[in-house]
């Protein structure tokens, strides 16, 4: 984990529901205390316990179900605390709010097997990478203060990328970030 080479940390960290509740697990080596607050406990603090090497925290919240919102309340060594979304959360509340949302991904089926088979065939071709910032690429004409969803963007973006011979996309931002005017370099998670 500490070398940055664990690519499936999302299977361990974050909120993982089962039939009776949800296991919450996060990495916070500098925290003195962490609690989880959410709809399942009327936003009252439930303690997370230090586990493993003392840098990970976890608790099981009976009754915490998919679709419910939650946040971590992280206490620093100086005694101050801050409410934080889950950096490994699978769902997020829309801005300006920042709660994470419990999601059950156990039934999700990836539909990219054709792409996965084809992707290794392109190693000898030149790269043409488009750095895409979703918030500034294009906005709906009829809703200038809003953004397209990822699904809505497909019919706009794919033809543009093909027309300009891009074969890779760097998507920014991938994580929730605190300021809509930024490019998303400062993740909230």
Residue ranges, per PLM feature:
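The feature marks proteins involved in alpha-glucan
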Residues: 1-23, 43, 51-131, 136-145, ...
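Conserved, mostly hydrophobic/aromatic
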Residues: 26, 72, 132, 161, ...
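Short proline/glycine-enriched turn/loop motifs at strand-loop junctions of beta-rich domains
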Residues: 27-34, 41-43
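Short, solvent-exposed loop/turn segments at secondary-structure junctions
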Residues: 30-31, 134-139, 175-177
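Short beta-strand elements bearing conserved aromatic residues within extracellular beta-rich modules
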Residues: 34-36, 70
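Conserved residues at the C-terminal ends of beta-strands
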Residues: 37, 135, 172
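Catalytic domains of carbohydrate-active enzymes, especially glycoside hydrolases
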Residues: 52, 155-177
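Aromatic- and acidic-residue-enriched carbohydrate-binding clefts of CAZyme catalytic domains
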Residues: 128, 143-146, 177-189
């Amino acid at each position: 984990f500490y070398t940055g080479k664990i690519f499936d940390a999302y299977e361990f960290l974050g909120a993982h529901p089962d039939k009776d509740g949800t296991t919450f697990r996060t990495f916070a080596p500098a925290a003195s205390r962490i609690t989880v607050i959410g709809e399942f406990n009327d936003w009252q603090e439930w303690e997370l316990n230090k586990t493993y090497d003392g840098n990970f925290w976890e608790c099981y919240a009976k009754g915490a179900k998919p679709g419910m919102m939650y946040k971590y309340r992280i206490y620093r060594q100086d005694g101050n605390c801050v409410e934080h979304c889950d950096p490994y959360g699978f769902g997020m509340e829309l801005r300006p709010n920042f709660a994470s949302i419990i999601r059950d991904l156990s039934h999700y089926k990836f539909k990219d097997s054709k792409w996965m088979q084809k992707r290794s065939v392109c190693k000898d071709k030149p790269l043409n990478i488009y750095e895409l910032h979703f918030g500034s690429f294009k906005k709906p004409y009829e809703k200038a203060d809003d953004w397209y969803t990822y699904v809505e963007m497909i019919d706009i973006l794919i033809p543009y990328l093909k027309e300009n011979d891009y074969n890779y996309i760097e998507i920014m931002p991938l994580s929730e970030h605190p300021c809509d005017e930024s490019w998303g370099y400062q993740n909230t998670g």
